[in-house]
Amino acid sequence: MRDDEKYQRRHLWMRTWKGERGLNGELLNDFVCIVEGEIVGRISEQETGPMRGTYKWDGGHSRRIRVNVLPQGGYAPDVHEAARKVEEHYDLLRQEAGLPPVVGVRVKD
């Protein structure tokens, strides 16, 4: 996939644990999605096991939104698709809760 075809994240993403290293000695590919100062999702690369090389995504972390949208998590083939899943899940949560969409919150990496 070319860079211009990859999903363009709309929200702030940060490493879950800055400086933490994985089994291979490289920085962990583990990130949280932050919207309006709140962690709303997480993605992490699967280093071992049958899903090795994929990214696990989890949504539904908002403490302010009290509705559930399923599925709340799953696996994606790459980091861009996993980020898309988390951001779209958060959009659905806001919609189900009757809240307006979040726009214009993307900040530089």
Task: Label each PLM-derived region with a short phrase.
Residues 46-50:
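Short beta-strand micro-motifs enriched in acidic
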